[in-house]
Regions:
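Beta-strand-enriched, solvent-exposed domains that form extended recognition/catalytic surfaces
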Residues: 1-3, 18, 23, 57-58
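A short glycine-rich, His/Asp/Glu-containing loop-to-beta-strand
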Residues: 1-7, 97-139
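A short beta-strand-loop-beta hairpin characteristic of the jelly-roll/cupin
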Residues: 8-37, 138-163
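Short glycine/proline-enriched turns and hinge-like loops at secondary-structure junctions
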Residues: 10-11, 53-55, 135
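Conserved metal-binding segment of the jelly-roll/cupin
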Residues: 35-53, 64, 161-175
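A short hydrophobic beta-strand segment most commonly corresponding to one strand
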Residues: 54-74
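Segments adjacent to and within acyl-thioester-processing domains across lipid
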Residues: 70-99
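Compact recognition or signaling/catalytic modules
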Residues: 113-122, 130-175
Length: 175
């Protein structure tokens, strides 16, 4: 609700905050960031973040728990700078051979920014289809924005998916 504040303290995880709707202010590490649109915001895992709703806001939080040694990997190999911020409309767009020409795929958090994690989106309009495919070494979660309604085929079984739903695609499943 407008005026609400949430404080997230450092844990053994990354707080991946996806603003779905509304206006929000993030305060972390002595800086403030204000957004009025869809955005992904990931504070440093060792930083406290205050989240203030400037309007009625909807945020999806993913807590991605760290494994031993990943802090060293972040510093040495990934060189990720926090907070990690990706405005949705500015996310890198790409084409996928399994998807139609009217489908827009976006990379919201590229791989090798947070160990074992990447975040993308698929956007289309009207009737559309994606060819069945699998990811033999990848678990996936699908989140449907509020303007979406679809059926997702998982291992050839239709699963209805409506607005603001999170769906788990098990490791190696055909979808």
């Amino acid at each position: 609700l407008k005026g609400s504040t949430l404080k997230l303290v450092p844990e053994n995880c990354h707080h991946i905050l996806i603003v779905l709707k509304g206006d929000v202010r993030f305060a972390t590490d002595g800086n403030e960031y204000v957004f009025h649109e869809r955005v992904v915001f990931v504070p440093g895992p060792d930083q406290t973040v205050a989240v203030e709703a400037l309007s009625n806001v909807q945020i999806l939080e993913i807590r991605w728990f760290k494994r031993e040694g990943e802090d060293d990997q972040l510093a040495a190999e990934y060189k990720t700078q926090f907070p990690l911020i990706q405005i949705y409309r500015n996310s890198k767009q790409y084409r996928d051979r399994n998807k139609s020409d009217k489908t827009i795929s976006r990379s919201c958090i590229d791989q090798r920014r947070i160990p074992r994690f990447a975040l993308g989106s698929v956007e289309s309009y009207g009737v559309d289809a994606v060819k069945s495919h699998d990811h033999p070494m990848l678990d996936q979660f699908f989140f449907s924005f509020e303007e979406n309604e679809m059926d997702v085929l998982i291992d050839y079984e239709a699963v209805p998916m409506g607005a603001n739903e999170l769906l788990y695609i098990p490791l190696g499943s055909i979808h």
